[in-house]
Amino acid sequence: LSRGLGDVYKRQIPYAVADFAEMRERGFYYVDKTNYIPGLEDYNAPIFLRPRRFGKSLLISMLAHYYDRTKANRFEELFGGTWIGEHPTEEHNQYLVIRYDFSAMVMADDMEGVVQNFNDLNCGPVEVTVEHNRDLFGDFQFTTRGNAVQMLEELLGYISSHGLPKAYILIDEYDNFTNQLLTSYNDSLYEEVTTSDSFLLTFFKVIKAGIGEGTIRTCFCTGVLPVIMDDLTSGYNIAEILTFKPVFLNMLGFTYEETKTYLRYVLDKYAPGASEERFEEIWQLIVNNYDGYRFSPVGERLFNSTILTYFLKKFAANAGSIPPELIDENLRTDINWIRRLTLSQNNAKETVSYTHLRAHETRGNL
């Protein structure tokens, strides 16, 4: 919750803040999820799935700052006052972080265009890693440019041959652009993208080989649906989906306890003097409007962190008055997106996977 500086001022409510460093530097209220880091270190190829707007990008950013060797001098600044700041693992700030963001992928109408857009987006992350770690890479320059797979291979080869620290790969929204193909009714192109010799399968084959050879410590992926990994199993059969594992159920989203603590903070700072009756009134409104996620029969109820934070930010801005709009229109579920994934004859697997993912949701107003 704190940055180790004491809670002596009003912390801002961090609506739509996905950068961990910004979260800490600007003193935003942070619901601490760093206690899940040690458990994640038991896996080499974990995948964690949650619905849209559930805090996945902030989790990716937090892990990037934790493992990046170039951020070692900022460890106390960024993690002071958090659980992991008090219980750091031996692996903190030990790796060459390579961070991909597939949510920024631009679609195309044919395979050639998709490949080009994939390369345009994903050549940059390895170049950034080299530049940020120039003290290790010296005068190294890529011999191949414009091909994301080959550049990743070349980087891993250099790591291996020069005994450099391992890479730690993070992929945010790994299924975003393939989901776009499905929702745009481009099934034939989707099939091309996920075939055995496609650029995407080759990309994950390189990662699998790197994990096996010891040049990659971990490849952590977030996404919404498991279907893409189902279709890529021949090339990436080491993936471990953590979505429904009991120990990780609360890694994203806010529990009742976390939400009550958050609400009490907002009332104390932005509506001082609010009575317990006022707390109970607002709490009941929150439960009635935002309660709706349970990812296991034995799991706790969870709130969507982005939707809840939207309400609390508006509530704070109104000095403790209930805002007229309880949900940001930009966050309402894209019904066409769900309909496309669940009604297409050719996407039966998507139907099963998506239904399973949301099987234990209750009545959230998304």
Question: Where are each of the predicted segments found?
Answer:
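Walker A/P-loop-proximal flanking segment of P-loop NTPase domains
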Residues: K10-R53, L58-Y67, E76-I84
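P-loop NTPase motor core
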Residues: F79-P125
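Structural recognition of the conserved hydrophobic beta-strand(s) that form the central parallel beta-sheet
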Residues: L170, R217-V224
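C-terminal helical "lid" subdomain and adjoining coupling/linker elements of P-loop NTPases
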Residues: N289-E350
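Single conserved hydrophobic/aromatic residue that forms the stacking wall/gate
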Residues: L1-Y9, H356-L366
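Substrate-engagement module of ASCE P-loop NTPases
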Residues: Y158-S160, Y190-I216
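Conserved P-loop NTPase mechanochemical-coupling segment
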Residues: A16-V17, M105-A148, T178-Y190
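Amphipathic alpha-helical segments of the small helical/lid subdomains adjacent to P-loop NTPase cores
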Residues: I228-S234, L242-F311
